[in-house]
Structures are given as structure tokens and as C-alpha cells.
């Protein structure tokens, strides 16, 4: 008997079981966000339909919130309300992934359900036609929480050759990145690209443009898929905004934003108006832009300082960057570079809408 079990999934052995018929039934994997900003999931059997289930056609389910930090033990049931449905790239058709909101037994949204408030803001300001695009940076770690490919008792060569790198010694775990990309495409996630990042073992994928609340839904589903894919390769995914102290880049969740008026000729006026409003609420935004962001927003490594608000054209050291092309045309979008990689996309997109267009009354 082996002294320790493998950390890898045995995907090859699993294949023959995945090919077995399901006799008119499907597996629905319900996914939710826990108290630590991670994803959890569990499965249930449902009758197969000719067309894909809509969220409102799926049953509300529940889980033990005392085991996820979302409810006390004496009143532990938390309800899962389906909000978005995706094809399952792991089990294949007709199986589905069901992104769900968390609700308390008394009919109120769970305190960690940030989607509910964001959805109200998106609905109230739908006439602005908001588009978002998020750039999710992350770091791949081994089982001992060391970045993949790093020397066990030392450090790799300084940053420089790794960003968008090609070749051994410049990138690691590209197989995870490729598998994740294909899973997102299969599931219908609006993934728009990927690249190796500045620090070795750090990668980025982009999701968007997405309309309104769809942004948070697709980013969270993409995060879930990344964790699931990484299981197959024995890797851990870290969204820590500064996983390695010192002269190494941190990890962010750069947020690109525009409205219909910003995308039209003369839209720079609306972009500048929005930036002024963002400046006035800098501290409020920082409060929901991720844990540990002070270690990343130092004014170095392509970041602005957490203590000040700046903006500029093509300036990656600013809080807000206006792309040079947009500056030249006079319309387009802007990039909020402040959010950390572990921030909740619902909170990011929600507070941007609130700051630019006003809060929603209860």
C-alpha cells in the first residue's frame, strides 16, 4: 500500500465512466460563493429536458451554512437560488453547471451574497448600457504553496522574460491555461483571451465585454472552472494580490468599463465625468477592492498608490488608465487598475455603477 495518496485526479480512468448513458437524467452542479470568497459546489440529479434549463425552472436547494462560515449551527440552512446556467465541460452534455445566489431562511440575501445588490444597481441603470471587461490575474502554486517552477530554496531570474513568454524556463503549467480556456469556451463563458504575466507562474485571463450583472456571473464561473481544471494537474490557484513579497509583481483584477455614451463620438466627456466621481469615493472603492490590496498598491510594479487617486492616458502606474487609442479618438472606455485579484466582481461592478449613477433606494 502506498504511504500517501496522489494529489492528481486519475482522469484517464474516469473517461470510461463518463461515457456511460444517464437514462434520461442529468447532473446539475450547483455552485455558490462562500464566506472566504471561494467557490463551493454540490451535485443533484434532475430529469433531462429537450432544451437547457432556465434558472427559474430549476429547484431551489440548500446547504449547511455552518460548514462554510455563512450561517450559525443552530440555524444553518442556507438556500441556493439558481441565477445562471452553463453547459458542464467536465461531464459533458446534457449535464449543467448552476451558478446560485445564497439566501437565508427568512427570505433575506445572505450577508456574503453580493450579487443581489449589484443586480439591483444594474437593473436601475440599465439605460446606461454598461459594459465591463475584467482581467483576472492569478498564480499557480504547487502542493507546498510554492509558485510552480520556482527553485525550492531560491528565486528565479528577475522579471523580464516571463510576460507573454514562450519556451521552457519562461512559462510553466501552460497545459492548465489551455485546458481552462477550452472549458470556458465550451461552457459559454465570455472569455476573450489569456497570457502569461510578469511574474513567473503568474497568468491572466480576460472575460468580457459583458453587459451588466453578466460580468460577475461569467467571472465567477471562470474562477470555478480554473480551480476544477487545476485539480486535474495537482496545482493550486492563488488569487492573493501579493503572493510573493519583494521585487515581484502583484496580481490584480483590472476592470474595464464603458457606457453607451462613453462609446459614442464625444464620449470622453462622460469618461472624465465618471473619473471625477470615482476620485471623490476613492476610499469607498478601496474598501471593497480586495483583501491585502495594500501590499500590491504601492506605486511600484505597474500600480498606483493605495493612498492617492491618479489617472492618465496609457499610464499603468495610475489608479485609472485611459487607453491611448481611446484618448486619441475621444471616446471608448477606461480601466480601473485598483481592484485586487481576490476582489468580488459583483462588488467591483456594483460600486462603479453606484458611484457613477447613484445608489438604489430600498
Curated annotation (Swiss-Prot):
Where does this polypeptide localize? Cytoplasm
Q: Which domain of life is it from?
A: Eukaryota
GO molecular function annotation: ATP binding; glutamine synthetase activity
Q: Does the keyword ATP-binding apply?
A: yes
What UniProt keywords are attached to this protein's entry? ATP-binding, Cytoplasm, Ligase, Nucleotide-binding
Q: Which Gene Ontology cellular-component terms appear in the entry?
A: cytoplasm
Q: Where in the numbering of this chain does the GS beta-grasp domain appear?
A: 26-107
Domain GS catalytic residues, every copy: 114-362
- Tell me which EC number(s) this protein carries: 6.3.1.2
List the catalytic activities from the record. L-glutamate + NH4(+) + ATP = L-glutamine + ADP + phosphate + H(+)
One Gene Ontology term of the biological-process aspect is: glutamine biosynthetic process
Quick check: keyword Nucleotide-binding in the entry? yes
Quaternary structure and interacting proteins, as annotated = Homooctamer.
Which family does the similarity line name? Belongs to the glutamine synthetase family.
Q: What is this protein called?
A: Glutamine synthetase
Q: Which organism is it from?
A: Neurospora crassa (strain ATCC 24698 / 74-OR23-1A / CBS 708.71 / DSM 1257 / FGSC 987)
Q: Which gene encodes it?
A: gln-1
Amino acid at each position: 500500500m502506498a504511504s500517501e495518496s496522489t494529489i492528481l485526479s486519475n482522469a484517464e480512468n474516469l473517461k470510461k465512466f463518463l461515457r456511460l448513458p444517464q437514462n434520461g437524467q442529468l447532473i446539475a452542479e450547483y455552485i455558490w460563493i462562500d464566506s472566504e470568497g471561494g467557490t463551493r459546489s454540490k451535485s443533484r440529479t434532475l430529469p433531462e429536458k429537450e432544451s437547457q434549463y432556465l434558472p427559474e425552472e430549476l429547484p431551489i436547494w440548500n446547504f449547511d451554512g455552518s460548514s462554510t462560515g455563512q450561517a450559525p449551527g443552530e440555524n444553518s440552512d442556507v438556500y441556493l437560488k439558481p441565477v445562471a446556467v452553463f453547459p458542464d465541460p467536465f461531464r459533458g452534455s446534457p449535464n449543467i453547471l448552476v451558478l446560485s445566489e445564497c439566501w437565508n431562511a427568512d427570505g433575506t440575501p445572505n450577508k456574503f451574497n453580493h450579487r443581489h445588490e449589484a443586480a439591483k444597481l444594474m437593473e436601475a441603470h440599465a439605460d446606461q448600457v454598461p459594459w465591463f471587461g475584467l482581467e483576472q490575474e492569478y498564480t499557480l502554486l504547487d502542493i507546498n504553496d510554492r509558485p510552480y517552477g520556482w527553485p525550492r530554496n531560491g528565486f528565479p531570474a528577475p522579471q523580464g522574460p516571463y510576460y507573454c513568454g514562450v519556451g521552457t524556463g519562461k512559462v510553466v503549467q501552460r497545459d492548465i491555461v489551455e485546458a481552462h480556456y477550452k472549458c470556458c469556451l465550451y461552457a459559454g463563458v465570455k472569455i476573450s483571451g489569456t497570457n502569461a504575466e510578469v511574474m513567473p507562474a503568474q497568468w491572466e485571463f480576460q472575460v468580457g465585454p459583458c453587459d451588466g450583472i453578466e460580468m460577475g456571473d461569467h467571472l465567477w464561473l471562470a474562477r470555478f472552472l480554473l480551480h476544477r481544471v487545476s485539480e486535474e494537474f495537482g496545482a493550486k490557484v492563488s488569487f492573493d494580490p501579493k503572493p510573493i513579497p519583494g521585487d515581484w509583481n502583484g496580481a490584480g483584477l483590472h476592470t474595464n468599463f464603458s457606457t453607451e455614451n462613453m462609446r459614442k463620438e464625444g464620449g470622453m466627456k462622460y469618461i472624465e465625468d465618471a473619473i471625477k466621481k470615482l476620485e471623490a469615493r476613492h476610499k469607498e472603492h478601496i474598501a471593497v477592492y480586495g483583501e491585502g490590496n495594500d501590499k500590491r498598491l504601492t506605486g511600484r510594479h505597474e500600480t498606483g498608490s493605495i493612498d492617492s487617486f491618479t489617472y492618465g492616458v496609457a499610464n499603468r502606474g495610475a489608479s485609472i488608465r485611459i487607453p491611448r487609442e481611446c484618448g486619441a479618438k475621444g471616446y471608448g472606455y477606461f480601466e480601473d487598475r485598483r481592484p485586487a485579484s481576490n476582489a468580488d466582481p459583483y462588488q467591483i461592478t456594483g460600486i462603479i455603477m453606484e458611484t457613477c449613477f447613484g445608489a438604489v433606494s430600498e
